[in-house]
Amino acid sequence: MFLLCLPFAGGSVTAAPASELTTVAEVRALGGAGEFVEHSVRLRGVILLELAVDPTTGLDAFMFADASASIYVASPPGRISGLKRGDLLEVRGLAARGDFAPIVVASGVTAQGTGAIPPPAPVTFDQLATGRFDGQYVEISGIVRSSRQAAPPDSRALAELSIGGGRLVVNSQDGQAQSLPVDSEVRVTGVVFQQFSRTGQAIHPFLVVPYGVPIVITRPPPADVPLRRIDRLMAFSSEGAPGHRVRIRGVVTHHQPGESLWLEEDSHGIRVHLHESAAYTVGESVEVVGFAVQGNYSPEMEDVSVLRLALANPPRPTVLKT
C-alpha cells in the first residue's frame, strides 16, 4: 500500500519551461485545475524522510523540506547515496505534476552539511482527509486501536489510531508502532501520504514516522476496563474515559468466522466485529474487550479480544407477531 500510494509515477508536464522556483511552497502552488506549466527549481533544504526506490521509475526518492513546506523528490540513482534525514541539500531540477500533488524531478543534488528539521504542523484528521497536507510534516494525537507487524512480504510496523473524525494508519520506519500498547493515548509526528483514486482524488491519509522520531505515549491504557451491560453501551455517563475500551458479556447467538459475532444479554443483542478465525458455538458465554462504536442501528464493538467463559443454553428466541 505504501509504495503504491507514493505521489509519483512519471509526473507529467505539458508546456515550455517557465521561471525558476526557489521554495517548496511555490512548487506546491502549481497544483490544482488547469494546464500544468513546467518550471525549473533550485531549492535549499533538508532531507525529511528517506524512502525506497520508486518502483515505477527506478529513481531514488525522498521527502525534502525547506522553511515553507515539504515535497516528494525523485532523484537519479546514486545521487543521494549515503545521505540521511537532516542533511542539508541544494536540489536542482524540474517541477512536475505528480499523480496527486506536485513533485520535483531532480537533475542535480548537492550536499551542503547538516540543517534543522522544520517543526511539525499540528493537524486534525479532518484536515488530513482533505488531501491538502499530502507530503507535509505534521503532528497528531489519538488512541491506539491496534498495533501489529504487517504480514510478509510486507515488513512495515503499523498502528491504527482513532482520532476525532476518523482512523489513521501509522507506519514507523524503525518498528516502534507495532509495540504500542492498545488503548494508550499517543502523539505521533510524521509525513502524510495520501491514498488516492485513479482520477487523483483523495481517499484516505496515512502517516509515515521517520527513523529516530519517537512516538510519544502521553497516557498509558487505563488500568481497569469497565464492564458495561450491552443495553447501556454509549448511553449517557458523566464518568469514564470516552473513546477507550469497555468490557461486555453475552451469549453467542450467531457467528461468521473471521467477520462477526452476535451476542445477547437479557434480550439485548450486539454485533462484534472480528479479525480472528476461531470458531464459536451458539450458546457459548463470552467476555469481549474492545471499543464501542455507533453502528447503523445500535452500538457495535470493534478491535476486540474475546475470552471464552462457559457453554450455556442458547437464549430463547423472541416470538415475532404478524
Residue ranges and their predicted role:
Residues M1-G11:
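Bacterial N-terminal signal peptides
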Residues A16-T322:
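OB-fold single-stranded nucleic acid-binding module
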